[in-house]
Amino acid sequence: MDTNTLHKPPIHFNQMTWFDRFIVFCGVGFGSGLAPKAPGTFGSAFALLFVPLWLYLGLSASIVVIVLMSLIGIYICGHTAKVINVHDDGRIVWDEFAGQSITLLPLLYLQQMNWLWVIVGFILFRIFDVWKPFPISWADQKVSGGLGIMLDDIIAGLWAALCILIFHFYLLT
């Protein structure tokens, strides 16, 4: 995925149906993915605005919402890629919303949702999302459509979440 959106074809919202406009607006992270440089980082940072929601919902309800967000994201990301005619365009950041949210789930479980841990989670997720160790790289290269767009970020979120658990249990206790 290209991190520079300056040379991508423009997204013409005014030429879309209201439904396509709504789905693409969600797909580009309510506009956060339209940043000219590093849209994935901006989308991941925007996802941190969900932290109060996860705190309010608690662990069980947050898991349900994040699973639904991920399942709906398969359609949103796939449809957005089809409408703008670019597969896994860097401006599509709904997948970052899901991956970043998955990363933060251990903080709810551990009751450690504070800004230091949230920033650690943000950094870990971005490292895995950019670095793409196996099986993230496999999902990124071999799985197509909306599932492919979502899957690499879901796996990156799981890797980052695992790192948070390891840091907490083996380094801090």
Question: What would you call each of these model-derived segments?
Answer:
Residues 165-173:
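Juxtamembrane boundary at the C-terminal end of a transmembrane helix
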Residues 41-45, 60-67, 93, 115, ...:
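Hydrophobic alpha-helical transmembrane segments
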Residues 35-47, 51-54, 61-65, 69, ...:
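Short Lys/Arg-rich amphipathic alpha-helical segments
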Residues 2-42, 75-103, 126-158:
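Interhelical loop and helix-boundary elements at the membrane-water interface
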